[in-house]
Amino acid sequence: MIKHITTTPAKALEKLKAGNARYIDAKVNSEDISQAKRTDTLVNGQKPYAIIITCSDSRVIPENIFMTGIGELFVIRIAGNVIDEHQLGSIEYAASHLGAPLIVVMGHTPVSYTHLRAHETEADL
């Protein structure tokens, strides 16, 4: 059975903000990504303290932006941050089964997907 992290949404958000401040200052993620940590998460399960919904853009890396290690974030990537029942199922799984107490929708600019969709809509008018 997976042990849930006992934290509050406020504490999880505080931890994300602190990690982001370290990222802005250092831009190097020194969190544990060792083989031992990977093995531990395989044996004992993942225990994320936050669910991050973010764009599919390969340049947006939540684990680095928030300076986290393996198993700390449950990241869901979707173009334009538009969720449907599949992403909602992942959110429910992370919150209900894994015990992640915080959901963050992380956007960025410019968003190519949104720009593309807007121009496709204009062309259809």
Annotate each predicted stretch with a short phrase.
Residues 105:
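Conserved functional hotspot residues or short segments at active or partner-binding sites
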Residues 101:
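Short acidic/polar active-site loop segments enriched in Thr and Asp
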Residues 2-82:
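Short, conserved "active-site rim" segments that organize catalytic pockets and cofactor/ligand binding
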Residues 83-98:
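Thiamine diphosphate
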Residues 79-82, 108-112:
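Acidic, glycine-rich active-site loops and adjacent beta-strand->loop/helix elements
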Residues 114-121:
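Conserved small/polar residues in nucleotide/adenosyl-binding loops
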Residues 65-69, 89-91, 117:
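Short, glycine/charged-enriched secondary-structure capping and boundary segments
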